[in-house]
């Protein structure tokens, strides 16, 4: 009988072999890897890397196989990820990225990026994504406000300075 730690080690080694142990990652057995990540999460639901890798693989399967059922499955797991790990910028930032790039819903992406920047460990790139999204959806007032907010937190942030100058020039 394996301990949970031994089982996790075995699962992660198998994932590594199936995903990265092939000459081209496109040759990996993504559905099997997704199932292995589900097993990892049964043992340790706090493994943010497992959540994010599994969701990315589901999105990749949807794109590569032109099968939207994988995308719907990915969204289901995105919501579960947030419900189990709601605290911390990383969950919200990743989900903002999911809705920005994978399951396109820019307004929902903005909401999650806004949640992410409330945490003290939010990175400049989170602000950059939020600013770019606000500009893209035409909310220049919010974009400007987030530039100012980013500059308060990250003095001399070149991206925020550049965007602020562009927004003020309009």
Residue positions per predicted region:
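Structural marker of alpha-solenoid helical repeat scaffolds
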Residues: 43, 84-85, 118-119, 152-154
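Terminal, low-structured helical/coil segments at or just beyond the last alpha-helical repeat
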Residues: 1-2, 11, 124, 136-170
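Structural signature of tandem alpha-helical TPR/SEL1-like repeats
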Residues: 28-35, 64-79, 102-115, 137-146
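Short coil/turn linking the two alpha-helices of tandem helical-hairpin repeats
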Residues: 15-27, 55, 59-66, 96-104, ...
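N-terminal leader/linker segments that initiate helical-solenoid repeat arrays
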Residues: 1-36
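Residue-level recognition of tetratricopeptide repeat
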Residues: 47, 88, 122-123, 156-157
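Alpha-solenoid helical repeat scaffolds
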Residues: 52-53, 90-94, 124-132, 145, ...
């Amino acid at each position: 009988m394996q301990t949970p730690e031994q089982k996790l080690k075995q699962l992660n080694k198998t994932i590594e072999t199936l995903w990265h142990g092939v000459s081209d990652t496109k040759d990996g057995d993504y559905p099997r890897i997704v199932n292995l990540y589900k097993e990892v999460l049964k043992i340790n639901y706090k493994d943010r890397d497992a959540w994010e890798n599994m969701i990315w693989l589901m999105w990749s399967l949807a794109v590569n196989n032109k099968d939207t059922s994988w995308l719907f499955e990915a969204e289901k797991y995105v919501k579960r990820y947030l419900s189990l790990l709601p605290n911390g910028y990383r969950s919200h930032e990743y989900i903002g990225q999911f809705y920005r790039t994978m399951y396109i819903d820019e307004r929902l992406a903005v909401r999650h990026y806004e949640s992410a920047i409330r945490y003290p460990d939010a990175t400049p790139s989170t602000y950059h994504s939020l600013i770019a999204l606000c500009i893209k959806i035409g909310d220049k007032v919010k974009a400007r406000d987030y530039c100012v907010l980013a500059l308060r937190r990250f003095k001399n942030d070149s991206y925020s300075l550049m965007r602020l100058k562009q927004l003020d020039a309009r």
